[in-house]
């Protein structure tokens, strides 16, 4: 490929602390009425002094450890100065000169196999407020309203090195990061609600000439799919400009969900534009060795570790293990199921197909469903005892999922119990053979697929209730015995 994208990400993770970064207002403000979770501190009133949230610092250290970062025992807050309607203080409290962590990495499944994406820095900062645009888009709004509820909500910003080589890798990185912060319990990682936000910096290299375009920042990508789509669009836009011999402007562009294009928002700021200086009202953050050890002991088993254990302990293929451990709740559900039905691979197949299909259709987590390990115990028992076929099991599963009824109850209510009467099935096969001598002759002349005709006949006559394994056995016996 002649043109190669070079991508780095700047990710904001909203922390699930009880209170905001520097005041006692609630941090979970998503569903609150506008401007109801504010105080003099988070709205920057004269004389109000910030007090750092210890839980925010602990969550940042946990995340940094999970991302293999170097933790700095000394870090400091700074003021990032800029004007925007949703920033009442006129500055944002952040960490610029001395971040809490640097030099980490996250391993992902890249386009050419396993790869490390280096993390340049991880630092703490407070969120700004939120502009609500009439018309739901800044480019089409006739006016905007300001909601200050989000001011002061604690964030960690994670900045990667430009190690990402495709839009797909950017999406994979984001998905992996969300999985980690959810495992840690430091954030919901919900992009639709703004708990995980991603800005991407993309440039393009012409591998034939070595020429590299200017860097463009892309914002407003509020789902994993949009991260990939926006970067695909921007890559194509930059390539077309390079092919025309045009210079690519260094700017910030926003993804427009309606038109599926990026639109220019403003020129790209330089770091000097923000006039950073130390925050005089907050003392430095000093972490002891004892504190770091204490936090390290709180780390749970993370997705990669859990996937390796699933392969080792349950004999699962790597693909299964990664899918099951991508969600902490799904992994826990699988292990609970294994306790009552000790058939890991069969359970894995069901969870990765039938369960995930139902969850994705409803856009819910496994913990929000009515499904329990006992449902699988009952379902597998029905199949093992020959009372239902796997076909019937899959047909009733959506109702099991939706209603929470036991499979055996649904089977009984609908009269779906499998027919295992050998004499009845044999009579039906003989009848089919008498009525269709050509199919019999085809089978005997080597066209083994002709047996499918007799299977279909039996299933039609029994409304799909005949035991398929028993039916096939009887058909083979009668056809080869003639």
Swiss-Prot record:
SMART domains: GatB_Yqey (SM00845). GO terms for biological process: glutaminyl-tRNAGln biosynthesis via transamidation; translation. Gene3D superfamilies: 1.10.10.410, GatB domain, N-terminal subdomain (1.10.150.380). GO terms for molecular function: asparaginyl-tRNA synthase (glutamine-hydrolyzing) activity; ATP binding; glutaminyl-tRNA synthase (glutamine-hydrolyzing) activity. Allows the formation of correctly charged Asn-tRNA(Asn) or Gln-tRNA(Gln) through the transamidation of misacylated Asp-tRNA(Asn) or Glu-tRNA(Gln) in organisms which lack either or both of asparaginyl-tRNA or glutaminyl-tRNA synthetases. The reaction takes place in the presence of glutamine and ATP through an activated phospho-Asp-tRNA(Asn) or phospho-Glu-tRNA(Gln). PANTHER family: GLUTAMYL-TRNA GLN AMIDOTRANSFERASE SUBUNIT B MITOCHONDRIAL AND PROKARYOTIC PET112-RELATED (PTHR11659), GLUTAMYL-TRNA(GLN) AMIDOTRANSFERASE SUBUNIT B, MITOCHONDRIAL (PTHR11659:SF0). Belongs to the GatB/GatE family. GatB subfamily. NCBIfam families: gatB, PRK05477.1-2, PRK05477.1-4. This is Aspartyl/glutamyl-tRNA(Asn/Gln) amidotransferase subunit B. The lineage of its organism: Bacteria, Thermotogati, Thermotogota, Thermotogae, Thermotogales.
